[in-house]
Structures are given as C-alpha cells and as structure tokens.
C-alpha cells in the first residue's frame, strides 16, 4: 500500500520517443463522417418563454417626480425592493434608490406604507411577545385556514367524547 511517507521512485531508463512517425493515414480504425455529425450548438431548451421585458424602458427617465416608475420598485410595506427582484442593472438600481429617497424627503412618497403595515403589525407583535421565536412565519390566510381546521378537529373530538359519555351512562 502506498503511503505519503514513502519516496517517489524514478524509473532508471530515460523516456525515449518512438522511431516511427505518427500519420493519420495509417490509422487502423476510421469513422465515417456521415454517421456522426457534430452540431455547432449543443441542444438547449429555448429561453424564449422565460424572457422578460425590462422593467425600465429606454424612454423612461429615472427621476423623483416620475411616480408611476418609482412605485414599481417599492414593496407593499414601502421598502425599496432588491436588485434581484427588480432585475435592474447596478446603475439603474442606484438611480432608482436615489430617486425614491429624494421623493421621500420631498414628501412625494411616505417613508412607510401605513395601509399595509396593519397586516404585518399583528404578526410582528406575536413574534415579539411569544415565548419562543418561530423560524417560519405564517401567511395570514393560511394561518386563518389552519386555525379553522384546528377548531373543527377540536369540535369533532368533543362530540366523540360526549357520545362516549352518553353511551357509557346507558
């Protein structure tokens, strides 16, 4: 078994080139060119259905007064969306960020969106006051559905217990 502590042993005979030159015409096995064709481009799925139009057109000016453009890059809570979500270049994202901040300072935009803040407020309070931190937060609709299913389960269990009590009394 070879271990790293053993030295590497060199062969005593030097490497020598073969005397016969290599020529392609003397090759014993030749492939026919008709059976195997090399395609210039490898097979790929077309990216056309996933191609999205850019969020900023060539004629759009990135300015704090252009509210229709700025509102596309702000979340429901009033936060500036990341570059990955926006699919913008670095330069465009920087200009959008500056325009949003300028619009906030000049009172064109609120710093927070208070209408949508109420949805997230109840969730954040439960996280702060909870006895243990939760890793995944529930979407309000799913939480409501989950709670209604739990209530139905509890009601069914109570009915079963009542039926057992009634049958045992007889």
Curated annotation (Swiss-Prot):
Species lineage: Eukaryota, Viridiplantae, Streptophyta, Embryophyta, Tracheophyta
Top-level taxon: Eukaryota
Cell location: Plastid, Chloroplast
Stretches for region Disordered: 1-60, 149-170
Positions annotated as Sequence repeat: 4-10, 11-17, 18-24, 25-31, 32-38, 39-45, 46-52
UniProt KW keywords: Chloroplast, Plastid, Repeat, Ribonucleoprotein, Ribosomal protein, RNA-binding, rRNA-binding
NCBIfam families attached to this UniProt entry: S18
Name this polypeptide is given: Small ribosomal subunit protein bS18c
């Amino acid at each position: 078994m070879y271990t790293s502590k053993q030295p590497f042993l060199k062969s005593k005979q030097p490497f020598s080139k073969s005397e016969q030159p290599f020529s392609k015409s003397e090759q014993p096995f030749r492939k026919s060119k008709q059976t195997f064709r090399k395609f210039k481009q490898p097979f790929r799925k077309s990216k056309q259905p996933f191609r999205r139009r850019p969020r900023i057109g060539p004629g759009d000016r990135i300015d704090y007064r252009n509210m229709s453009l700025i509102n596309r890059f702000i979340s429901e809570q009033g936060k500036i969306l990341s570059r990955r979500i926006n699919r913008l270049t670095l330069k465009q994202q920087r200009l959008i960020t500056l325009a949003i901040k300028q619009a906030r300072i000049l009172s064109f935009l609120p710093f927070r969106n208070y209408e949508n803040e109420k949805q997230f407020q109840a969730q954040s309070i439960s996280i702060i006051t909870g006895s243990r931190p939760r890793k995944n937060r529930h979407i309000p609709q799913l939480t409501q559905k989950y709670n209604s299913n739990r209530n139905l389960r509890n009601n069914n269990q109570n009915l079963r217990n009542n039926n057992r009590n009634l049958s045992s009394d007889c």
